[in-house]
Amino acid sequence: MSETVSQNKETRGFQSEVKQLLHLMIHSLYSNKEIFLRELISNASDASDKLRFQALSNPDLYEGNADLGVKLSFDESANTLTISDNGIGMSRNDVIEHLGTIAKSGTAEFFSKLSEEQSKDSQLIGQFGVGFYSAFIVADAVTVRTRAAGLPADEAVQWHSAGEGEYTIENITKESRGTDIILHMRDEGKEFLNEWRLRDVISKYSDHIGIPVSIQTVVRDEDGKETDEKKWEQINKAQALWTRNKADISDEEYQEFYKHVSHDFADPLVWSHNRVEGKNDYTSLLYIPSKAPWDMMNRDHKSGLKLYVQRVFIMDDAEQFMPSYLRFVRGLIDSNDLPLNVSREILQDNKVTQSLRNACTKRVLTMLERMAKNDEEKYQSFWKEFGLVLKEGPAEDFANKEKIAGLLRFASTEVDSAEQTVGLASYVERMKEGQDKIYYLTADSYAAAKNSPHLEQFKAKGIEVILMFDRIDEWLMNYLTEFDGKQFQSITKAGLDLSKFEDEADKEKQKETEEEFKSVVERTKSYLGDRVKDVRTTFKLASTPAVVVTDDYEMGTQMAKLLAAAGQAVPEVKYIFEINPEHELVKRMADEADEEAFGRWVEVLLGQAMLAERGSMEDPTQFLGAINKLLTKV
């Protein structure tokens, strides 16, 4: 970082990510350039909220002026547009921290996702939240003059940058509290140096802002001619949207308010606005976004609702009102029961908080249930974005486990597609007569699941199997043990019994074959020793000679892989080797009198089974050697 200091004036270099963001924004967001005004007015509104909150404990911060608002003025001759607020303001350190750096975790990961394709970049930048930097879409230079509430006039700060990689910062004198942002407009931004253009944008984006947004207008005489006099005229309604009657709020207003609270560019999928009176008195406005934030799976991802108490802003990202598996929900909660001096620590162990959390959780789950029932296409859109996060729910929220399970979607053998469109309720509706379990299979990929040998008898008998191939699925099934009174059953576990779907003649024939093959099973056990837990015959296969399975209480293959990928110690998985006595290769093995040749057959069949189950084997050389010797003999 380069710095030059002249008295109190410094020239500093931007954090490298800021330079990249400025460049991308100017080129990617130009087609939607009016959003700069939404972002800057939104920031000014936040500054007023923060002042109100701090003034609760220190009223002197108002400095005799508690009428908060945002004012816009322009000067065509100077080519400038100024956005002013009398909110909390910033100190010198605040300015350096907020305007010279992007104080977000995972920024490097975010920038690695950007491409040269403007449409994709603009969407990603929108998810990232551009805030103050959006000013450079229309301005070739920006000046910020600010004084933090409570600081003397001579400790105000001026920040200036042309967005080229560095900025200057110096102390100035500023009598009024708050922030002035002066935009030196590019030629392409001059359209905003117009009263009617500003009115239009403010009405579009800022009607819901809870403080007045005014513009400086020219006073006209009785004949309608302009005079030299100017006045401030409030443009927005200045009533917090969530305090209004639902019937009076249009979809467009709800959508714009969502963009204000989330800094998202896209419209939300659905929302729920509720006023509750009774044991707890509160208003909630909850949104489900249409796109997942780029860092949703990042552990440092900020989530939660905006918290207001009696319409006074208290904090952003109040995570205590929404469980982690619903961390994608945006919006706010306004409570009349929490104290105005509430802190995050107090929220943690507060009965009101727990009650509001439970209510908000149920509200979101109900919203999702309605969407799934009434608009399958929209729900699929939601599932593609947030399905992985929702799968965390059964482990986290025992009380709502059944509701969450009903919202989960999977691939299945019923639908020849990797798309996860099958709900558990529809699976249960299609269950065969006499079927009392929900059968499922976990694998590394859809292709591996779809082609698994474990499916052969299920396909032959027309029994639907749910196919799971997300990394989280094996972990999920430790917590999701039943749905609608039906137990889940992994088809890769030993002891799987499909005999109820067999006729008596088949059962009798299998019994005879099993008896005949006892000696083959014993020879195989003797050869393998403790390399496997057991050797058994199986009749659940058709075109596959052998598989490996695990006991019900043994760790499954996918869970072992998940732990290994996370760097955890993984206990050895002991497999049960199941051979299909009706397969030609197994019959050839059984007919082999020579023990050495018999062993080669065992190696080949076990190796195949391990490859199909794990995608790898401990000793591929031994497997290949056995194949080569058998081929040579042929």
Swiss-Prot record:
Keywords: ATP-binding, Chaperone, Cytoplasm, Nucleotide-binding, Stress response
Primary location: cytoplasm
Region (A): 1-344
Chain intervals for the UniProt region annotation (C): 562-634
Molecular function in Gene Ontology: ATP binding; ATP hydrolysis activity; ATP-dependent protein folding chaperone; unfolded protein binding
GO cellular component entries: cytoplasm
Chain spans, region B: 345-561
Pfam family for this entry, one: HATPase_c_3
Keyword Thylakoid: no
InterPro entries: HATPase_C_sf, Heat_shock_protein_90_CS, HSP90_C, Hsp90_fam, Hsp90_N, Ribosomal_Su5_D2-typ_SF
Entry similarity comment: Belongs to the heat shock protein 90 family.
Task of the protein: Molecular chaperone. Has ATPase activity.
Subunit structure: Homodimer.
Name listed for the protein in its UniProt record: Chaperone protein HtpG
